[in-house]
Amino acid sequence: MKRKELHETSRLAYGRRMTTRPAHIAMFSIALHGHVNPSLEVIRELVARGHRVTYAIPRLLADKVAEAGAEPKLWNSTLPGPDADPEAWGSTLLDNVEPFLADAIQSLPQLAQAYEGDEPDLVLHDIASYTARVLGRRWEVPVISLSPCMVAWEGYEQEVGEPMWEEPRKTERGQAYYARFHAWLEENGITDHPDPFIGRPDRSLVLIPKALQPHADRVDETTYTFVGACQGDRTAEGDWARPEGAEKVVLVSLGSAFTKQPAFYRECVRAFGELPGWHTVLQVGRHVDPAELGDVPDNVEVRTWVPQLAILQQADLFVTHAGAGGSQEGLATATPMIAVPQAADQFGNADMLQGLGVARTLPTEEATAKALRTAALALVDDPEVAARLKEIQARMAQEAGTRGPADLIEAELAAARG
């Protein structure tokens, strides 16, 4: 039986038993908004269906998952938190990956103890939670990855992974990283190589629009199911009113992590503050003092944090770091984008957005006031850009929703229960 048919048959069978057999589902994530927010509506839907959902999360974001109806299982993380200085993440590949392994190793005994005698029927996990996969193997229950960003396609390792790791693997530090990872897995009875252990889940729900996935035609859809952005009611984040007389509104945001860019923000003030009829909302984060921006004209609104989706629903342009969340919100609201990627998957997202014909990409060092203004004026009045955005927006509306992911999770539960 094909996986699609299995899902449908199992879902219907499971639905008949749900009234007497609710499941315990355990979700695992790290304390970063971009890793927690994308799946919250899926959690909310599972709770609404009668499942008990526990959520392994550091205290910093425990209230957020509790609001979705999950029971927080608290643990102490060694990773930089959501308000940490971006420089805490380092600047090299090994700087970026070593903290995740160290955190996984120290969190495993905490989480094993937290779930002792309360083992779940199924494990859900963010891609950064290596511990969840180890525990899922130990408990012999289904494990499903919830990916908030692009996933590996057939050929990814040869085209991206191996070239990226070629030099770090040769170093003593790189070899020590892999030796430590291998040893930790082997201690837990796992013989997988670390790379596929992290990057090749047995089952994954991809929480981005298929339009943002590179080489989507080469993604194994027996493993990965694209369910689109699962956006729920965001009114709790606050509202925003477009100023009267504003002919164009531009939102500038580099997300929640890599926001320490005062020089870039000054270029944005120069780029858009001098445009007649334009109003700019500039989110600078917690690590930039607005005084560092110098003289700011009245048509530039400087904020530490903004209700992003509420503004995008009224904006004419989005200057973004091209994180997965921001990219799909730009597409969902049909807002042209200038992508200024800062780290990780943002460079790939920026390439995808530009390839779709709905964005221009500027490296941070090239994002001068002149370059930003030129890109902005070219994008906002281009009818072809607007038409492409409307087409993608319509496709996304068909993908989106929380019932689909919940149905698929229930299908995996039913298949495991036989």
Swiss-Prot record:
It is an enzyme of class 2 (transferase). Its EC number is 2.4.1.-. GO terms for molecular function: hexosyltransferase activity; UDP-glycosyltransferase activity. The keyword ATP-binding does not apply. Keywords: Antibiotic resistance, Glycosyltransferase, Transferase. InterPro entries: Glycosyltransferase_28 (IPR050426), UDP_glucos_trans (IPR002213), UDP_glycos_trans_CS (IPR035595), UDPGT_MGT-like (IPR006326). CDD domains: GT1_Gtf-like. GO terms for biological process: antibiotic biosynthetic process; response to antibiotic. NCBIfam families: macro_glyco_Mgt (NF033129), MGT (TIGR01426). Specifically inactivates macrolides via 2'-O-glycosylation using UDP-glucose. PANTHER family: STEROL 3-BETA-GLUCOSYLTRANSFERASE (PTHR48050), STEROL 3-BETA-GLUCOSYLTRANSFERASE UGT80A2 (PTHR48050:SF13). Belongs to the UDP-glycosyltransferase family. This is Macrolide glycosyltransferase.
